[in-house]
């Protein structure tokens, strides 16, 4: 493969893969949240949707299977079929019923399984010199998929009903399957040619600075995750329709997220991972205060739109830096297991923040809750100096691979 072709083909494939990854995650964390809010389900129950995120934490227990059985491509295809069936089921059963929760959990399991295979494949095919470009494409595509899930599905629902919207959404994984059938590389996981992935992970954990790295993974995006959980319920509480919320997220949100992801990826390339984590993390934290101001002053539509622009752009910045960091510290030979464990730890913080969000926002009110989300970002930022040496050591150890 020529260098020019490699520089556009690998990021393009990453964009397709991570759109497929982001869409079901957006359904679980954005669409269902909005759907139940529109259906007047209690705010605390809406927040509990976040507890389904425990599935992404538990995926570490089946990630070795994906590293050792079959190909990443096969796992991705199987997960896409399961995602389609689960999405259709969400449209058929009543909201917040037992069957609805079962379908939601099935969707999460299929999505988490797909995540493992996609992350491993992306790490395997991405050289260090393309980390910035791939993660720009990844964040932009992933967030765009979440916006389509949270906004596009809502717009469709206002026109044909939520049942029709979920069934229409079920077609998207099948479209992606058809694209990836021709585009995804046909390479095996090659598990028989390397050491036990769990043993390799234990070696990684025992390296100097590993505990600090894990703490940063757990805490770095805690504030942003807590904020996102209560954005759509707040918009609905202010009298916006599902279509209005969808228009904001699909139009303004998509443009700003993609711009933020591209800018974040360029920032990583120019300034390195450590400085990107620190500076873009601060920007991401401060963006939470836009919603705090709007809720505190009960500001009108222009301010609401402005808060959405600031949050989505800055979210793209911070996420690009964070995902580059996760990929950088993984061993490519055990990509599925290592990345699954690290992302599972990240999911612990996300699940905790989101599951409690409805209760905290219900008791404090939206304004105080948004101030709290900004404060939740501080511990992760404060820990960054403790991992600076570890990142430098990782860069040195990976140098021969360039």
Describe the function of each predicted region.
Residues 1-8, 185-215:
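Juxtamembrane intracellular "pre-TM" segments in multi-pass secondary transporters
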